[in-house]
């Protein structure tokens, strides 16, 4: 429990339209000036170093959630290190991440081949930091093969495009890493919306435009939203993601705009834990990733 507590992030969900107390007037600094001091995602990834038996990286403060890397970034870094240590992997099909402790300080990421079959490859990947083991993950890669089955039950939300939706990341004291993303609320509710269902559909994109078909970039973006359960919150509260499981539905997703639609729905929230599902949609209406998440909520 000590490690979980150390990795908590306090979501202060007061809207910017409310009067700002003097202690947080720094949020009045122009956004362009803030971004000029930030580390682009591509620069962050390029800074990963190869060691004898692992890859290492140190995170700047603008990529943190409180004092630790947020789950999506940790997942993306594990995938990047796995690719660097294993050439010619087929597309990622599924991954399971357990966030054991805070990802702080100099991070070391080691990937180990678990099994290589004719079409699928399983890799185990651990991330350690100053506090010990931070992330334990299993990644499954699989080559495409002919199939007589083609079925989909997922239905894309009928929402307006990002240009016609209001800004999403407009809270005071939101996590530092959120400034790396542009968000537009397409449906559902903002956190701390009294009486609303705990669900949201938000258009997301990296401010650092790059190869938007990269699964590493997509994982970092797919976990950028706060838990949907925080729609029900009445006060700011610390949260900590415990586990994150993803299934990749499109081996090579296409995206010409940079925008992805994240549809997050809280299934249950009780006894201090929330379970939710998130679906990531491409701009042309294809589901590319489904994720399940268990979150500890301290409040």
Predicted regions span which residues?
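Terminal targeting signals and extreme-terminal segments of soluble enzymes
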Residues: 33-299
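Short hydrophobic targeting helices and cationic amphipathic motifs
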Residues: 13-16, 34
């Amino acid at each position: 429990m000590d490690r979980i507590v150390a990795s908590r992030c306090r979501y202060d969900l007061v809207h910017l339209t409310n009067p700002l107390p003097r202690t947080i007037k720094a949020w009045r600094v122009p956004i362009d000036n803030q971004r000029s001091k930030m580390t682009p995602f591509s620069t962050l990834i390029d800074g990963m170093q190869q060691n004898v038996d692992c890859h290492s990286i140190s995170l700047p403060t603008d990529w943190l959630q409180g004092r630790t890397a947020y789950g999506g970034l940790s997942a993306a870094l594990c995938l990047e290190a796995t690719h660097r240590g294993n050439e010619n992997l087929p597309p990622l099909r599924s991954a399971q991440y357990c966030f054991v402790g805070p990802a702080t300080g100099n991070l070391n990421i080691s990937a180990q081949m678990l099994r290589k079959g004719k079409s699928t490859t399983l890799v185990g990947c651990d991330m350690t930091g100053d506090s010990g083991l931070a992330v334990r993950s299993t990644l499954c890669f699989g080559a495409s093969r002919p199939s007589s089955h083609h079925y989909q039950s997922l239905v894309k939300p009928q929402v307006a495009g990002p240009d016609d939706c209001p800004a999403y990341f407009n809270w005071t004291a939101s996590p530092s890493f959120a400034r790396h993303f542009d968000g537009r609320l397409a449906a559902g509710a903002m956190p701390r919306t009294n009486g609303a269902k705990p669900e949201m559909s938000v258009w997301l994109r990296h401010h650092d435009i790059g190869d938007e078909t990269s699964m590493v970039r997509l994982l970092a973006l797919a976990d950028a939203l706060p838990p949907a359960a925080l729609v029900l919150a009445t006060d700011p509260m610390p949260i900590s993601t415990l586990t994150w499981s993803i299934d990749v539905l499109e081996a090579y997703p296409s995206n010409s705009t940079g925008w992805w639609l994240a549809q997050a729905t809280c299934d249950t929230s009780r006894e201090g834990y929330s379970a939710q599902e998130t679906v990531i949609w491409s701009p042309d209406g294809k589901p590319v990733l489904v994720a399940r998440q268990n979150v500890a909520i301290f409040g």
